[in-house]
């Protein structure tokens, strides 16, 4: 009983306080009838009905109803206070107060309009991206129709050497499917698993006119320290398997299933500007053409008495590309526009790596392959992932606890934040913009100059010590936007450097969005209209031609990776550069 009286007394005091704040003590809030507190104001005793002869009544209602009544009273009070504030601000505060209130309302309206415009732009970009994501997939796999084949070295016809690096040799190859092809290749001295240099004595070494072409390339890794077991080889050389396709390691007939460890490398999603490993398997090391001359020391002792290599190694099967970027630039001088498109392709590939949490760490013109479209325009593909950082557990943040931690393969094109890093208990190297810096250095080669980070002499720069003012100027024929972008990519501080995605968007806008950038007031709705026009034109161009040209492919990649935020960043960056000229 005492508890109930205490609660009732507290409720009465609360109501009295609320009534005093409103200035109308005779009414309860939202109910339209006098409350108990009204009697207190008139001097009446709470708990008794007004008037003579009235019977006494209990104070308040039951506890749940009392709380409901209190909640309704507070809600009514809040609504009336809000109405009073609006009335006073509009009618009682004078002209100055009205102006402030009007400006505040207009500001809120403008903010809401901007937010609605931004939401519409983001939604449009997402819809465009969804359409082109399905249309920007890589081309068909040459071995798609032979999913159960290609996992043994004996199934391939190996031709001449394509090239060699510091850890592998690459040979041209093909895989016959019909018996008549085998008969033709036997007559030319090409035997399964053997090259022309290993054919039997007395067999012809020249190819007949009907000899098959070599659409594939086989990369034979040099195994010096991995041992001879297949599982040890796959684990030691696992970085080479990062760009492997889903079926590359799923073979039968002697192929070893790769057991991916918890700290193993990531599997890279396919991208048109990144190499695909079609098959990967281990096999005995054969004596291939030029082996005794080009790399005798890494051969097993059964092939060369002084060889240090093991008897088995890893073989990777890929598409055969005509040349590397370095070889292409030795005999070709691309126009400034074509060179900008080549630079754009590298940035698209690097952006895909960053989105996947992978750093290549060995980008150079020798590790970039080139093929030509029907119009002779080069299509670039990033290859050789032997030095990549693709750890599931750390992503692009490499703990640098000691000098024994591997920072990558190419010291000349190592970004400043990597080359100047010093080990420590909490030291971390951020590779999120390191490959983009390397692309900026390769841009000099693409535009016809010597890479300033190669060679010797006064013109040679080192990534650990150079200053931006020392960077050589690109030719005047290069568009100003591209020159500014290359200098931005080579900023020493990674925080001042644009990401690969923003840099790619800068080139897209510079190449195909000139009339949008020419507008004095660049608005989102204008940008969305331009994107819709580009989408329609790109879809039409893609349907009218059997094989897309490089320009159409690049537009499709741009629209497949479309993000409103990064596109606006690129547009603002371009506008700031042009305003500074």
UniProtKB/Swiss-Prot annotation:
Reported impact of residue 67 to F: No effect on interaction with TIMM23
Residues modified as Phosphoserine: 228, 402
Effect on the protein of changing residue 98 to W: Severely decreased interaction with TIMM23
PTM (free text): Proteolytically cleaved. In healthy cells, the precursor is continuously imported into the inner mitochondrial membrane (IMM), where it is proteolytically cleaved by mitochondrial-processing peptidase (MPP) and then undergoes further proteolytic cleavage by PARL or AFG3L2 to give rise to the 52 kDa short form. The 52 kDa short form is then released into the cytosol where it rapidly undergoes proteasome-dependent degradation. Autophosphorylated. Loss of mitochondrial membrane potential results in the precursor accumulating on the outer mitochondrial membrane (OMM) where it is activated by autophosphorylation. Autophosphorylation at Ser-228 and Ser-402 is sufficient and essential for selective recruitment of PRKN to depolarized mitochondria, via PINK1-dependent phosphorylation of ubiquitin and maybe PRKN.
Effect upon mutating residue 540 to A: Under depolarizing conditions, does not affect autophosphorylation on S-228 and kinase activation
Record SMART domains: S_TKc
CDD domains assigned: STKc_PINK1
Result of altering residue 543 to G: Under depolarizing conditions, it fails to support PINK1-TOM-TIM23 complex assembly and mitophagy activation
Phenotype for residue 219 to M: Loss of enzyme activity and impaired localization of PRKN to mitochondria
Major localization listed first in the record, in broad terms: mitochondrion
EC number: 2.7.11.1
Impact when changing residue 362 to A: Abolishes MFN2 phosphorylation and interaction with PRKN. Loss of enzyme activity and impaired localization of PRKN to mitochondria
Top EC class, one word: transferase
Named cofactor requirement(s): Mg(2+)
Keywords of the record: ATP-binding, Autophagy, Cytoplasm, Disease variant, Kinase, Magnesium, Membrane, Metal-binding, Mitochondrion, Mitochondrion inner membrane, Mitochondrion outer membrane, Neurodegeneration, Nucleotide-binding, Parkinson disease, Parkinsonism, Phosphoprotein, Primary mitochondrial disease, Serine/threonine-protein kinase, Transferase, Transit peptide, Transmembrane, Transmembrane helix
Cytoplasmic compartment segments: 111-581
Annotated phenotype, changing residue 240 to K: In PARK6; loss of autophosphorylation on S-228 and kinase activation; no effect on interaction with TIMM23
Domain Protein kinase, first and last residues per copy: 156-511
Effect recorded for residue 536 to E: Under depolarizing conditions, it results in loss of interaction with TOMM20 and fails to support PINK1-TOM-TIM23 complex assembly and mitophagy activation
Effect of residue 219 to A: Abolishes MFN2 phosphorylation and interaction with PRKN
Disease per UniProt entry: Parkinson disease 6: An early-onset form of Parkinson disease, a neurodegenerative disorder characterized by parkinsonian signs such as rigidity, resting tremor and bradykinesia. A subset of patients manifest additional symptoms including hyperreflexia, autonomic instability, dementia and psychiatric disturbances. Symptoms show diurnal fluctuation and can improve after sleep. PARK6 pathogenesis involves respiratory complex I deficiency causing mitochondrial depolarization and dysfunction. Inheritance is autosomal recessive.
Stated family: Belongs to the protein kinase superfamily. Ser/Thr protein kinase family.
Name of the protein in its database record: Serine/threonine-protein kinase PINK1, mitochondrial
Gene: PINK1
């Amino acid at each position: 009983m005492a508890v109930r009286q205490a609660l009732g007394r507290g409720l009465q005091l609360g109501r009295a306080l609320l009534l005093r704040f409103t200035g109308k003590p005779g009414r309860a809030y939202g109910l339209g009838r006098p409350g108990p507190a009204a009697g207190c104001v008139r001097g009446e005793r709470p708990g008794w009905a007004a008037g003579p002869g009235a019977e006494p009544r209990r104070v308040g209602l039951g506890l749940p109803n009392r709380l409901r009544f209190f909640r309704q009273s507070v809600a009514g009070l809040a609504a009336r206070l809000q109405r009073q504030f609006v009335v006073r601000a509009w009618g009682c505060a004078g002209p100055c107060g009205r102006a402030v209130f009007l400006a505040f309302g207009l500001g809120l309206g403008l903010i809401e309009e901007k937010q609605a415009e931004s939401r519409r732009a983001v939604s449009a970009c997402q819809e465009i991206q969804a359409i082109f994501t399905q249309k920007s997939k890589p081309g068909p796999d040459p071995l798609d129709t032979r999913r159960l084949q290609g996992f043994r070295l004996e199934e391939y016809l190996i031709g001449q050497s394509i090239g060699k690096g510091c850890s592998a040799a690459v040979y041209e190859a093909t895989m016959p499917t019909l018996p008549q092809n085998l008969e033709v290749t036997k007559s030319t001295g090409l035997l399964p698993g053997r090259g022309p240099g290993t054919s039997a004595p007395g067999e012809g070494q020249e190819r007949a006119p009907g000899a098959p072409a070599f659409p594939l390339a086989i990369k034979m890794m040099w195994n010096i320290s991995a041992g001879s077991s297949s599982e040890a080889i796959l684990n030691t050389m696992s970085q080479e398997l990062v760009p492997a396709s889903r079926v590359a390691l799923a073979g039968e007939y002697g192929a070893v299933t790769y057991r991916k460890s918890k700290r193993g490398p990531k599997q890279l999603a396919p991208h048109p500007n990144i190499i695909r490993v079609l098959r990967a398997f281990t096999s005995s090391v054969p004596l291939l053409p030029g082996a005794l001359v080009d790399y005798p020391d890494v051969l097993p002792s059964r092939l060369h008495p002084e060889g240090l290599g093991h008897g088995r190694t890893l073989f990777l099967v890929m598409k055969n590309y005509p040349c590397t970027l370095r070889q292409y630039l030795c005999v070709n001088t691309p126009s400034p526009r074509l060179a900008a498109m080549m630079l754009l392709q590298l940035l698209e590939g690097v952006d895909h790596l960053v989105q996947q949490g992978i750093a290549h760490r060995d980008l150079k013109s020798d590790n970039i392959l080139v093929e030509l479209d029907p119009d002779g325009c080069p299509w670039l593909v990033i290859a050789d992932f032997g030095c990549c950082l693709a750890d599931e557990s750390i992503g692009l943040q490499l703990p640098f606890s000691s000098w024994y931690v591997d920072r990558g393969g190419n010291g000349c094109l190592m970004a400043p934040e990597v080359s100047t890093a010093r080990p420590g208990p909490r030291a971390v190297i951020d590779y999120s913009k390191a490959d983009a810096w390397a692309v900026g250095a390769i841009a000099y080669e693409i535009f016809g100059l010597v890479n300033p980070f190669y060679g010797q002499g006064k013109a040679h720069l080192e990534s650990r010590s150079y200053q931006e003012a020392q960077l050589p100027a690109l030719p005047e024929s290069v568009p100003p936007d591209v020159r500014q972008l290359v200098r931005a990519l080579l900023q020493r501080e990674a925080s001042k450097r644009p990401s690969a995605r923003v840099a790619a968007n800068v080139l897209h806008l510079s190449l195909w969005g000139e009339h949008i950038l020419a507008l004095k007031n660049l608005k989102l709705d204008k940008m969305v209209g331009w994107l819709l026009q580009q989408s329609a034109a790109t879809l039409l161009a893609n349907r009218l031609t059997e094989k897309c040209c490089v320009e159409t492919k690049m537009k499709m990649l741009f629209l497949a990776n479309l993000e409103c935020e990064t596109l606006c960043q690129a547009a603002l960056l371009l506008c700031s550069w042009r305003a500074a000229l």
